[in-house]
């Protein structure tokens, strides 16, 4: 089974993904502040992105792009 090369991201998800590619590992609170999303919106977005396989959570509320 080959991993899907391209994943369709929503525009807001693409903003977060590009941010994580640039920053590497980052705290959820910092992502929310820098990208301008409320935490309650960002947490759902991060979950969707994790399920799509484009980011992964790390201990301590850190996230990174895969």
Give names to the regions the model predicted.
Residues 53:
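Glycine-centered, phosphate/nucleic-acid-interacting loop/turn motifs that mediate DNA/RNA or nucleotide
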Residues 1-2:
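Short beta-alpha connecting loops at secondary-structure transitions
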Residues 8-37:
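Short amphipathic alpha-helical interface segments
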Residues 5-12, 27, 57-66:
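Short, cationic-aromatic polyanion-contact patches
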Residues 36-50:
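Short amphipathic alpha-helical interaction segments
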């Amino acid at each position: 089974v080959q991993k899907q090369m391209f994943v369709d991201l929503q525009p807001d998800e693409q903003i977060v993904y590009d941010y994580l590619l640039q920053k590497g590992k980052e705290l959820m609170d910092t992502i929310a502040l820098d990208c301008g999303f409320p935490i309650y919106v960002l947490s759902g977005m991060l979950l969707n992105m994790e399920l799509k396989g484009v980011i992964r959570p790390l201990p301590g509320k850190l996230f990174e792009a895969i």
